[in-house]
Every structure is written in structure tokens, then in C-alpha cells.
Amino acid sequence: MVQAVRCAASSLFLLAVVGNGTAQSNYQVVSLGSPGTIAGTVKWSGPLPRIPTFSINKDPEICDPESHKIRDLERLIVGPQGGVANTVVFLKNISSGKAINLPEPRRFLDQKHCRYEPHILLVAQDAELRIKSSDATLHTVHMDGAATYNLPFPFTNQIVSRTMPTAGLANVRCNGGHAWMNAEILVVPHPYYTVTDESGRFQLTDVPPGQYEIVAWHEGWKVVRQEAAFDVLTQRRIQRPIFSDPRIWEKKVAVGENQTAVINFVLGDK
């Protein structure tokens, strides 16, 4: 059941990326004469839902240096002015433009204090993802969806690299007994993707002039149930949170030469 839910979420993201066609391996890098920019915000509207926390029941001296004994699942981060962080904003079905060059911090996954940093990653299709563990405990990165890996990290500062050949959504969890750990990796077929900052702001630069569909994608914040699982490495039964499907919003945007188009998205718990 868990695998089916995650595969469905990956399919939803892939559909948003490529529409009804095939993955955009035919994206072409072209010279840009007078490109434009798309900028805007993603903001929350209405009361904030109650976001459940998770008890830290393994390696508290490593996972819980502040002794809070609970961990925020980091699924919905809303700033004081209502900006929603960790929302992926991208152009749908763009066929040509600038070369892909995603920021380095978004291509490197660290396991630190038993959480994944960053929580949302962008990795170019066919590029290399590097994964590190800064923790002095056993973590096992379990990945499914667009990529399927099960990678143990028994040593501190160990780095493992894997190529990500398939566009889509890869769910990341820990199979080392830290059931609250979760992250999402978006393997992207072109460079016009970004992730909102802590204020909910985003910007896409060097966009060829034209008409586009722009998508805001959020991983979803509701825990629909807890599911019992057996952790092979720790030989323990654990409870894993199972999350609701991602949320997707779409708009149309016109980009002019040397112009900035402003697009804002509003999210809510409906």
C-alpha cells in the first residue's frame, strides 16, 4: 500500500512536468537574445492546519540536541507574512532555453540531526546526486519513485553518489529506525524550476519570451495515517507517517522581452 501511494504521487508529479506527452529529454539549449523573468510569491490563506509532530524514540543524543523530544515533520513551513517555503515552481512543457545549472546546495543531501537537509531537492535529469551523513549513527536512505535506492550510511561524513536518470519525484525515507525523516527529490528535465524561500518568494530567470503554463507544486502536509512497518536493520517495529498527495496549482503566464512577469499563488487547506 505504501509503495502504491508513493508511486501515485510520483505519477502526479511526472504528469505535471510533462503533461500528456513523454519526458522532456528533447529539451534544447539555445542562445537567448532578450529573455524575461518570472517572479512572485506563494502564500497561505486561511487558518493553519495542525501539523503533527513525531516522537524522537531513537538516538536522542544525536537526533535531538535541543532536547525537545519531538520532531517537526517539515511538511508545511509558513513564514510570519504567510509565505510558504519549499514549494516547487516550474514551467510546464518548455522545449528550449538556457542550459541547466541548478544551485549546488539543491543537489547535495545531508543527514544532520536525523533530518534531511535540504528538505526539497532539485536534481537535473541524468545528473549526479551526492548524499552525505553528518550523524554518528546508522542511517539508511531508502528512495522510491523516480529512483530506487537503499543506501546505508554507517560512517560519519560518508558520501555516496548516484545518477538520477529518470524525471519525476523520488520519495526519501530513513530505513535506519528514524521513521520521521522524510524528504522529496525532484528530478527535473529542464532548468526552469525553483524552490520558494522562507518568505515564499521565487524567481525564474532567462526565460525565452512566450506564453507558458506555470505550476506550483507542494508535497502535501496532512498525515493520513500511521502505518506499521518492520525495520530490517534495527530489527524493530516502527510507525511510519503516510502523507496526503501533493497539491498542484497551475496558471498561464506571458513573458516579454527584458520584462518581469509577476505571478502569485495562494495555497489553503481546502
Give the positions of each predicted feature:
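Extracytoplasmic copper-binding redox domains, predominantly the cupredoxin/blue-copper superfamily
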Residues: Q24-K270
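Bacterial N-terminal signal peptides
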Residues: A8-V17
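Sec/Tat signal peptide C-region and signal peptidase I cleavage site
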Residues: G19-A23
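Bacterial N-terminal signal peptides that target proteins for export
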Residues: M1-A9
